[in-house]
């Protein structure tokens, strides 16, 4: 087989409502997020399950579950850092699933479920993976769950410049277990009159209630990064909407 590349976009959630069920396939989050470029570019090979991120070996907790699919080594190139809130854990898990499908003919549905479960069981994410799988720019996760079980709706909006600044590496676990009923209120407010600015305004309110404050206008802080609308200064990472989800070529 010729060498393959797997392209997976980033995902930054602005509003989320965790949903835990007895069937892990339907566990996840209802929420709003931005699926963005620049994507990660992943070079998979058959071999001992290992993850190399920008040429550095990383200990990736999800690998405990992902390695049950197949023996895959991933070499990942990324323009954004790991552990700051860009949804990279979900993106890496998704890439591992797609690599298992491509290299070993593992059933795609099974691979996606294991990748989803690896995120849930390590407390690394609830909605990143399904958002990155389908893509769409601004997305609404209507139903929680793995790809094929959850449901994602792509919201059509007029795009403006978006950029981010990574500030600090932080754990996801506390973030996703913080359940706020205001999330559902803000999601409904957004759906009533959707726009990119409205997404930023409501995400700012929601994340501020969780203790994440951004000093910049038209922006919000999610975990260890700030995402900003319109004002993209030097030193910030520029983003475009990832209209397509993850793909292999």
Give the residues covered by each predicted segment.
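Short hydrophobic-aromatic micro-motifs
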Residues: 5-8, 13-16, 131, 138-141, ...
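Alpha/beta catalytic cores of group-transfer enzymes, especially the acyltransferase/condensing modules
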Residues: 109-153
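Short glycine-rich or small-residue beta-strand-to-loop segments that form or flank ligand, phosphate
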Residues: 77-85, 223-229
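C-terminal nucleotide
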Residues: 102, 120, 146-249
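DPxDG-like acidic metal-binding loop motif
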Residues: 86-109
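ATP-binding N-lobe of GHMP and related small-molecule kinases
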Residues: 1-82, 235-249
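Solvent-exposed alpha-helices and their adjacent loops that cap or buttress functional pockets
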Residues: 6-7, 24-25, 33-36, 122-124, ...
């Amino acid at each position: 087989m010729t060498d393959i590349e797997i392209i997976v976009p980033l995902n930054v959630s602005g509003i989320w409502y965790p949903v835990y069920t007895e069937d892990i396939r339907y566990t996840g989050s209802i929420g709003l997020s931005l699926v963005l470029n620049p994507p990660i570019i992943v070079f998979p090979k058959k071999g001992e399950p290992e993850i190399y991120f920008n040429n550095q070996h990383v200990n990736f907790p999800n690998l405990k579950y992902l390695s049950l699919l197949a023996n895959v080594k991933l070499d990942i190139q990324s323009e954004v850092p790991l552990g700051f809130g860009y949804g990279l854990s979900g993106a890496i898990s998704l890439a591992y699933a797609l690599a298992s499908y491509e290299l070993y003919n593992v059933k795609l549905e099974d691979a996606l479920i294991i990748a989803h479960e690896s995120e849930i069981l390590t407390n690394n994410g609830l909605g990143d993976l399904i958002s990155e799988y389908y893509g769409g720019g601004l997305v609404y996760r209507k139903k929680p769950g793995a790809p094929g079980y959850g449901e994602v709706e792509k919201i059509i909006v007029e795009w403006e410049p978006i950029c981010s600044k990574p500030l600090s590496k932080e754990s996801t676990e506390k973030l996703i277990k913080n359940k706020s009923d205001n999330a559902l209120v803000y999601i409904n407010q957004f759906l009533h009159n959707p726009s990119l600015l409205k997404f930023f305004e409501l995400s700012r309110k929601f994340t501020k209630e969780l203790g994440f404050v951004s000093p910049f206008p038209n922006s919000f802080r999610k975990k260890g990064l700030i995402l900003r609308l319109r004002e993209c200064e030097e030193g910030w990472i520029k983003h475009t909407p990832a209209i397509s989800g993850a793909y292999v070529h």
